[in-house]
């Protein structure tokens, strides 16, 4: 089948993890601004597509996207195409997304395999339990998608490039062998400075 539940449980040790995850301070996190221009491959999270398409990606992210090898996930494709068909801008947004997807080389678009799906389920369950969020608000599904992207990147030896700071910080705490590169969009940076 390709998924070894016993090995995944041995590796993640969900039964031994207690308490609540806490986001690390910014100085302890890997930021796009601190990354060398030339480096290892990137695995793009959905936040990257949204920020680039809306013109709000920071310069450091744009530079990394220009010079680094970029891989893509079918999980993000799924997230990008969940739109309300009745919304006035949906047709235009879908055209933009379609053009973006057409630019992705087929050999750089990856689908999670059975092992990654199984591991992601265990990891997402652990993340949900340790994040202490309320049930029934969609967090579990979001965590499965984040875990899929994180584990796919790890499998490829790539770093996840993402603006989803909290969730990917948590994932990298739970699986320290996965790599992440974080950023804040300029709008998010302004909100932090004023708040």
Language model regions located:
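Short, well-structured N-terminal submotif of metal-dependent ribonuclease cores
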Residues: 1-99
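Acidic, PIN/NYN-like endoribonuclease modules and their adjacent C-terminal/linker elements
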Residues: 1-35, 150, 154-195
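Active-site neighborhoods of divalent-metal-dependent phosphate/nucleic-acid chemistry enzymes
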Residues: 2-6, 26-28, 109-159, 163
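Short active-site oxyanion
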Residues: 39-40, 68-69, 106-108, 154-159
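Alpha-helix capping/helix-boundary segments
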Residues: 48-49, 76, 116, 149, ...
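Generic detector of contiguous secondary-structure segments
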Residues: 61, 96-118
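Phosphate- and divalent-cation-binding pockets in alpha/beta enzyme and binding domains
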Residues: 79, 119, 170-171
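Short, hinge-like loop/turn segments at secondary-structure boundaries
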Residues: 87-91, 127-128, 178-180
């Amino acid at each position: 089948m390709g998924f070894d539940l016993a090995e995944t449980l041995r590796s993640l040790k969900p039964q031994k993890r207690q308490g609540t995850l806490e986001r690390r301070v910014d100085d302890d996190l890997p930021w796009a601004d601190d990354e060398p221009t030339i480096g290892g491959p990137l695995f793009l999270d959905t936040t990257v597509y949204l920020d680039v398409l809306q013109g709000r990606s920071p310069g450091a992210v744009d530079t990394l996207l220009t010079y680094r090898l970029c891989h893509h996930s079918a999980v993000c494709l799924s997230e990008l195409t969940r739109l309300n068909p009745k919304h006035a801008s949906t047709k235009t947004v879908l055209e933009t997304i379609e053009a973006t997807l057409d630019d992705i080389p087929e050999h750089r678009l990856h689908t999670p395999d059975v092992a990654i799906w199984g591991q992601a389920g265990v990891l997402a369950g652990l993340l949900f339990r340790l994040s202490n969020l309320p049930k029934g608000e969609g967090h579990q599904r979001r965590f499965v998608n984040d875990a899929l992207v994180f584990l796919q990147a790890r499998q490829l030896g790539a770093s996840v490039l993402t603006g989803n700071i909290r969730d990917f910080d948590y994932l990298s705490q739970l699986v320290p062998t996965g790599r992440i590169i974080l950023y804040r969009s300029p709008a998010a940076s302004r909100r932090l400075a004023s708040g």
